[in-house]
Amino acid sequence: MKTKPASVRELAVYPIRTVAQLTGVDARRIRSWETQHGLLRPARTQGGHRLFSQRDVDTILRIKRLVDEEGVQLQGVRLLLAAEEAGESFEDRVMAFPPRG
């Protein structure tokens, strides 16, 4: 049985230091979003180092925008990402959350 080749966007190639530079999000915050909030699932090297795909980078930028610009709490972000994975409209869901005041 042939496996479908990963698209370029799904190849895990960026170490966390590079992702932090690309996104402007501190590496500690990225780790927290993964380990404490379950928002990210980066690949790991055999040595346990995180490797992120372009899709992961896009997700981090999306999380950053939602939290920092839209005022969505991380629990809401988790629900929005789950909705997107289920095929629901991500942007429509954002509008359903009132901004924090």
Where are these regions (language model features)?
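Short coil turns linking two alpha-helices in DNA-binding domains
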Residues: 26-29, 73
